[in-house]
């Protein structure tokens, strides 16, 4: 076989074998059955899908009532001081707010899917609102 000329190559710097730590060596020598059992973990996305199905089945309000009521009162302060609210009025506002947010997230998800993504981003919300005509 004919000899070929060797060209110089840059070394990639192979790693030298390191000494094992005492804990690693002890772990390897210990029997596998005597170890602590790992807690069960679902695959990524499984719990998310379960939560989606659960919340789509349910009809209860998802935002806590008192924090929402405080937010409504805080926003109302900017328009008129000493406003009073019937409890049914706050409930109606909360129903409408949650319905709006659910619809917005549905449209946002469609925008993310259109961009060949599964993760929603702020730009998806902005696009959904722009298409709806809520913000120019």
From Swiss-Prot:
The modification N6,N6-dimethyllysine is found at residues 5, 10, 28, 37, 80. SUPFAM superfamilies: Histone-fold (SSF47113). A lipid is attached at residue 19 (N6-decanoyllysine). The keyword Acetylation applies. The modification N6-crotonyllysine is found at residues 5, 10, 19, 24, 28, 57. Its main location: nucleus. The modification Phosphoserine is found at residues 11, 29, 58, 87. A lipid is attached at residue 111 (S-palmitoyl cysteine). The modification Citrulline is found at residues 3, 9, 18, 27. The modification N6-lactoyllysine is found at residues 10, 15, 19, 24, 28, 57, 80. Keywords: Acetylation, ADP-ribosylation, Chromosome, Citrullination, DNA-binding, Hydroxylation, Lipoprotein, Methylation, Nucleosome core, Nucleus, Palmitate, Phosphoprotein, Ubl conjugation. The modification 5-glutamyl dopamine is found at residue 6. InterPro entries: Histone-fold (IPR009072), Histone_H2A/H2B/H3 (IPR007125), Histone_H3/CENP-A (IPR000164). The modification Symmetric dimethylarginine is found at residue 9. The modification Allysine is found at residue 5. This is Histone H3.2. The gene is H3C15.
């Amino acid at each position: 076989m004919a000899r070929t000329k060797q060209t110089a190559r840059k070394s990639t710097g192979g790693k030298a074998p390191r000494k094992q730590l005492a804990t690693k060596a002890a772990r390897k020598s210990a029997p596998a059955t005597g170890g602590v059992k790992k807690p069960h973990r679902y695959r990524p996305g499984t719990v998310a899908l379960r939560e989606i199905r659960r919340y789509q089945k349910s009809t209860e309000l998802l935002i806590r009532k008192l924090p929402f009521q405080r937010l409504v009162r805080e926003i109302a302060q900017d328009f008129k001081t000493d406003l009073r609210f019937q409890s049914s009025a706050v409930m109606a506002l909360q129903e409408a707010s949650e319905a709006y947010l659910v619809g917005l997230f549905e449209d946002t998800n469609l925008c993310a899917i259109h961009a060949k993504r599964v993760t929603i981003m702020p730009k998806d919300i902005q696009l959904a609102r722009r298409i709806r005509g809520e913000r120019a």
